[in-house]
Amino acid sequence: MPQNEYIEKHIKQHGRRLDHEERKRKRAAREGHRVAKDAQTLKGWRGKQFAKQRYSEKVAMKKKIKAHQESKVKGPSTPKENDGEALPTYLLDRKDTNTAKAISSSIKQKRMEKADKFSVPLPKVKGISEEEMFKVIKTGKSKTKSWKRMITKHTFVGEGFTRRPVKMERIIRPSALRQKKANVTHPELGVTVFLPILGVKKNPQSPMYTQLGVLTKGTIIEVNVSELGLVTAGGKVVWGKYAQITNEPDRDGCVNAVLLV
């Protein structure tokens, strides 16, 4: 690896901070405030450069908006029959099919199909507070340090998981609350199978919980469905499919999920 890519090397070896996605989202949300402050306070050469950059951005945005509005121009979807009358030059293009409208409608149709494909049984779930999710662990000789946290919900850690050294482990995932398999129900076949979990795709509570593998109600998990014998249109065996957890694993002691088909 080149010497100047030490940041990428560190990310590959140690990963990112647990709250990286949250910090990134907040930084993007604050960007508008920073731009407004710079526009008011920058003086001299830096102010001129900033104004020039903002001007070019606004011009590009106006062009983009204008192009988007032109794509919505209504026109005849089918050309009229030729009745033998001559048309003036400025009316000749009105007989052509409006391709922009056709492209726009096809994009909307694809979006609707995609939304229908990835619709889930539980679109909304109740939020979980950090006080309920994490338990504070007191450490140190006199038990005065409180930088450690223990997850009180069920988690999935994977096969090759090894704990960090005790002195460096900030978040503890108890062995008794780790799950490896789930009771997955196929909605069309109406059967329930005990399938191994491959990974946690998305936890609706927070990206940090997704990275930690926390299993709560509404979480999307990937399960091994090779035992069901599902095949694709090309004849290949389906290995993993997504499922959504429909129960509270920490209350029931098991994971129940519905397969997303």
Swiss-Prot record:
Pfam families with a match to the protein in the record: Ribosomal_S8e
InterPro entries (alphabetical):
NSA2_fam (IPR039411), Ribosomal_Se8/biogenesis_NSA2 (IPR022309)
Q: Where is the composition biased (Basic and acidic residues)?
A: 1-22
- Please give the chief subcellular localization of this protein: nucleus
Which keywords fit this entry according to its UniProt record? Nucleus, Ribonucleoprotein, Ribosome biogenesis, rRNA processing
One GO BP on record is: maturation of LSU-rRNA from tricistronic rRNA transcript (SSU-rRNA, 5.8S rRNA, LSU-rRNA)
Which Gene Ontology CC terms are recorded?
A: nucleolus; preribosome, large subunit precursor
Q: Where is this motif: Nuclear localization signal?
A: 15-22
Where in the cell? Nucleus, Nucleolus
Where is the segment annotated Disordered?
1-39, 61-85
Lineage: superkingdom: Eukaryota
What quaternary structure, including any partners, is listed in this protein's UniProt entry? Component of the pre-66S ribosomal particle. Interacts with NOP7 and RRP1. Interacts with RSA4 (via WD repeats).
Q: What protein family does this chain belong to?
A: Belongs to the eukaryotic ribosomal protein eS8 family. Ribosome biogenesis protein NSA2 subfamily.
Give the protein's biological function. Answer: Involved in the biogenesis of the 60S ribosomal subunit. May play a part in the quality control of pre-60S particles.
What this protein is called in its record is: Ribosome biogenesis protein NSA2
